[in-house]
């Protein structure tokens, strides 16, 4: 006698027990993934998802969630993906969910994958959304193969990786979402954590889940300067007039004797020499 499991029984809550950094090996290359841009801000998180997918030898296609649904369905149908990835901000979540339902209606065999801070903050509340096939809690790293290997209605837990392993795939994004490529101000980040505990932010969720030691080691460590310069050189190929330094706290660790003091001094000099675009910082 078979047993039918309800979605809330299949989706399980995240444990976030740190079991080591994410594996950067790929066991299932060659699949097709669509990434959905929503809203008017640069989807800086999703471009790292794109980077991880390309590094694992998958094919990607960007679509603009602001475009007509019929137009997007045609593009998706032609590309024939196995998965569609959404990483909306909380303010864009309902829009992304509406789009996922419309796509699911036309293409029921395509798997919708939702991740990002909104999922991280309220995974329990999203279990019963029928248009969502996979929820990804935490970083993308280590999650791609898990998505491919897991049954539907699974909550996937990602794992952190060192910033030196993290590089966004911006060219495809700016070319395929031209209204973002044409923006005069682009984003860049040197680390992905925050030392504060604002009540409206999910930073505290991540820090508590993984622990302060792991959080500092992976989220607060600076990216290699050469990686950031490589990223910024691509910005020069597009219509970029200025760059926003989007770290939650650019000056973290730059007090006298701090770990990042020398890093920031060196970054400033290299940026001036090789990029020389105005920067704005948080």
For the regions a language model picked out, list residue spans one by one:
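Radical SAM enzyme core and accessory elements
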Residues: 1-36, 54-57, 62, 69-82, ...
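N-terminal [4Fe-4S]-dependent radical SAM core
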Residues: 3-29, 149-191
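Residue-level signal for short, function-critical loop segments
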Residues: 37-40, 90, 192, 249
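Glycine-rich beta-alpha loop elements in corrinoid/cobalamin-binding modules
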Residues: 38-39, 49-53, 61-167
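Conserved alpha-helical elements of sugar-nucleotide-dependent glycosyltransferases
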Residues: 41-48, 227, 263
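Alpha-helical structural signal in soluble globular domains
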Residues: 52-56, 102, 106, 129-131, ...
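Radical SAM [4Fe-4S] cluster-binding motif and immediate context
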Residues: 171-282
């Amino acid at each position: 006698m078979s047993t039918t499991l309800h979605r809330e029984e299949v989706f399980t809550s995240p444990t976030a027990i740190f079991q080591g950094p994410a594996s950067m090996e790929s066991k299932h290359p060659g699949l097709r993934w669509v990434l959905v841009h929503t809203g008017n801000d640069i989807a800086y998180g999703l471009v790292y998802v794109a980077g991880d997918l390309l590094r694992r030898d998958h094919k990607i296609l960007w679509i603009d969630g602001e475009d007509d649904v019929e137009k997007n369905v045609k593009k998706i149908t032609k590309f024939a993906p196995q998965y569609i990835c959404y990483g909306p901000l909380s303010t864009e979540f309902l829009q992304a969910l509406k789009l996922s339902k419309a796509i699911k209606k036309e293409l029921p065999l395509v798997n919708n994958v939702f991740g990002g801070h909104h999922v991280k903050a309220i995974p329990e509340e999203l279990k019963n959304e029928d248009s969502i096939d996979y929820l990804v809690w935490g970083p993308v790293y280590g999650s791609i193969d898990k998505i491919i290997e897991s049954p539907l209605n699974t909550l996937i837990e990602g794992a952190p990786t060192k910033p030196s392993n993290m590089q966004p795939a911006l060219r495809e994004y700016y070319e395929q979402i031209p209204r973002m490529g044409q923006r005069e101000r682009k984003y860049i980040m040197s680390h992905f954590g925050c030392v504060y505990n604002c009540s409206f932010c999910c930073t505290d969720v991540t820090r508590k889940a993984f622990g302060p030691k792991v959080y500092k080691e992976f989220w607060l460590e600076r990216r290699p300067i050469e990686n950031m310069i490589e990223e910024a050189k691509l910005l020069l190929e597009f219509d970029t007039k200025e760059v926003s330094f989007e770290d939650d706290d650019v000056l973290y660790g730059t007090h006298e004797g701090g770990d990042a003091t020398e890093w920031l001094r060196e970054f400033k000099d290299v940026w001036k020499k090789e990029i020389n675009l105005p920067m704005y910082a948080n």
